[in-house]
Amino acid sequence: MTSKTNMTSNKFAYDFFPWSNDTNSSQQIKNIKPPPKRSNRPTKRTTFTSEQVTLLELEFAKNEYICKDRRGELAQTIELTECQVKTWFQNRRTKKRRCTSPLRKSMMKKSDERSPSPQNPSSQHVQNLQTFFHSWPSHFAYSLPSDQQNNV
C-alpha cells in the first residue's frame, strides 16, 4: 500500500515539476559554484589630492546632487572613478547635514559659553560690517541721497 502512495506522490511531483526528475538539471545545480569569498582585509581608502578636493567642493557648491553625465565628466577630469565621485558627494552631503544639525549647533553654543573669549567672532564680524556700511558712501565718488533731500 505504501508503494502505491509513493508512486502517486512522485507522479504528482513529476506532473507539476517535470524538471525535478531531470538528471541533467540536477547535474547543472551541482556544478554551480558559490561566489568567491571576500577577504578580511578592508578596502583601500582613497586619498584625494588638494586639487581633487577643490574641484569637488566647487562642484558641490554649485549643486549638492551631481547628475550622471556631470559625474562622468568630473571623474575623468580629476582622474577618479565615477563611483568615487558619487561616494564623495554622498559623504559630503552627510557632513553638511551633520554640521548644520540643531544638536551640533546647541553643542557649539554650550562650548562657546564655557570658553572665555573677549568677543564672539560672529558679533565681531557683524560690527565690522556695520562699521563698513556706516562709512559706505565715502568709499564712492558720488554720495547717496540724504534723508533731507528725500523729504524735499
Swiss-Prot record:
Alphabetized UniProt keyword annotations: DNA-binding, Homeobox, Nucleus
InterPro entries: HD (IPR001356), HD_metazoa (IPR020479), Homeobox_CS (IPR017970), Homeobox_TF (IPR050848), Homeodomain-like_sf (IPR009057)
Subcellular localization: Nucleus
Lineage: superkingdom: Eukaryota
Keyword DNA-binding: yes
Region (Disordered): 21-48, 92-126
Name of the featured protein: Homeobox protein ceh-63
Subunit architecture: May interact with homeobox protein ceh-14.
Pfam hit, one: Homeodomain
Protein's job: Probable transcription factor, modulating expression of helix-loop-helix protein mbr-1, perhaps acting in concert with homeobox protein ceh-14. May play a minor role in axon guidance in the DVC interneuron.
Ranges annotated as biased composition (Polar residues): 21-30, 116-126
Transmembrane domains' residue ranges: none
GO CC annotations, alphabetized: nucleus
Residues annotated to bind DNA: 41-100
Record-level Gene Ontology MF annotations: DNA-binding transcription factor activity, RNA polymerase II-specific; RNA polymerase II transcription regulatory region sequence-specific DNA binding
Disulfide bonds: none
Encoding gene per record: ceh-63
Biased composition (Basic residues): 35-44
